[in-house]
From Swiss-Prot:
Record-annotated membrane-spanning stretches: none
Keyword Transferase applies: no
Reported function: Binds to the consensus DNA sequence 5'-YCAGAGATGCGCA-3'.
GO biological process: regulation of transcription by RNA polymerase II
Main location: nucleus
Zinc finger (C2H2-type) residue numbers: 171-193, 201-223, 229-251, 257-279, 286-308, 315-337
Protein's cellular compartments: Nucleus
The protein's name: Serendipity locus protein beta
GO cellular component: nucleus; polytene chromosome interband
InterPro entries in the cross-refs: Znf_C2H2_sf, Znf_C2H2_type
GO MF terms held by the record: DNA binding; DNA-binding transcription factor activity, RNA polymerase II-specific; RNA polymerase II transcription regulatory region sequence-specific DNA binding; zinc ion binding
Length: 356
């Protein structure tokens, strides 16, 4: 009798259901790289095609290995970029200033995750007298324009910068979301007390520890086929993770912001800010020294001070002798000179009705 227990697609071992996750839609936390793309690359290493089915799953141990593989390859990419920058930086053509296009290309020399540079022997072209500079410039352009890929491009994969295949040199912390320039700096940050103390929630799918339940709620997008730059509850998208969390407060409606003066609670930070501004206006009211009138905002207070200025500008009314200190007040005053249209009475309406 055959076993009905699920098995891992990577290691082939049978395990309990709770330790598995479907490979389809599974993404590496932080980089948004699909796990199935990593496995496709390993087809070339083992020289064998891997038949991924919709119900193919991987155990947590193997997923952790794949996550670590992604981290190691990104470290290799950063080191390779530093070496490439050093090689190009010390080989600038003498007597020629570097153009903006060349500088931009040199800054982009890097190898994204899961991509390997294939070393090929370059045959040095024969140079004619006086063509040294042109030949060196040509070799630089060839090197900078070369694409480093390990597989054929897939038309089904998104290519726009706003989609989650965007390649970036910054690495986000999976606990607090802060961005770092290298894996080494990120690991130092994670080991620091400030980051470790913020671990309060754990994903029950991949075991990832994050800052709190709100960050965990956003992290679940990765297991549901979305990115961490999209709202989990609506179709809105944002450019930064912190903006998504700020927007999702509308859906949570937890009223976690409380006024320390009156105890009123709010679900959005800007609502409490406006509320605190009203408290501040009441406690630190602006009083006119001339007439002792009280104002709640600086705008109305400054507007009132103009009425006491002897050299204040005046805006006279063309229909009467009155003048005003600002154009808006004059505009409101002009309405008194406009004829008021009286509403037509019911009797008049009946008199104008024509019967056919």
């Amino acid at each position: 009798m055959s076993s009905t227990r699920p098995f891992c697609f990577v290691c082939g071992k049978e395990k309990s259901v709770g330790v598995f996750q479907l490979i389809e839609g599974c993404i590496v936390p932080g980089t948004f790289k699909p796990i199935k793309d990593i496995l496709k690359y390993f087809e070339k290493i083992i020289n064998q095609r891997l038949e991924l089915l919709p119900n193919s799953a991987a155990c947590r141990d193997c997923l952790e290995y794949l996550f670590n593989y992604d981290r190691l390859v990104r470290n290799l990419s950063q080191v390779q970029r530093q070496i490439a920058d050093a090689l190009l930086g010390c080989r600038q053509v003498e007597g020629k200033a570097e153009t903006k296009q060349q500088a931009a290309k040199r800054a982009r020399v890097q190898v994204p995750a899961f991509k390997i540079v294939q070393a090929t022997a370059l045959k040095e072209p024969e140079r004619q007298p006086g063509e040294e500079d042109e030949c060196e410039e040509f070799m630089k352009e060839e090197m900078l324009d070369e694409e480093f890929q390990f597989s054929e491009p897939d038309d089904s994969m998104p290519s726009s910068e706003e989609e989650f295949f965007t390649e970036t040199t910054e690495i986000p912390c999976h606990i607090c979301g802060e961005m770092f320039s290298s894996q080494e700096v990120l690991e130092r940050h994670i080991k620091a007390d400030t980051c470790q103390k913020s671990e309060q929630a754990t994903c029950n799918v991949c075991g990832l520890k994050v800052k709190d339940d709100e960050v965990l709620d956003l992290h679940m997008n990765l297991h549901e086929g979305k990115t961490e730059l999209e709202c989990r509850y609506c179709d809105k998208k944002f450019s930064h993770k912190r903006n998504v969390l700020r927007h999702m407060e509308v859906h949570w409606d937890k009223k976690k912001y409380q006024c320390d003066k009156c105890g009123e609670r709010f679900s959005l930070s800007w609502l409490m800010y406006n509320h605190l501004m009203r408290h501040d206006a009441e406690e630190n009211a602006l009083i006119c020294e001339v007439c002792h009138q009280q104002f709640k905002t600086k705008r109305t207070y400054k507007h009132h001070l103009r009425t006491h200025q002897t050299d204040r500008p005046r805006y006279p009314c063309p229909d009467c002798e009155k003048s005003f200190v600002d154009k808006y007040t004059l505009k409101v005053h002009k309405r008194v000179h406009q004829p008021v249209e009286k509403p037509e009475s019911a009797e008049a309406k009946e008199a104008t009705v024509t019967f056919f």
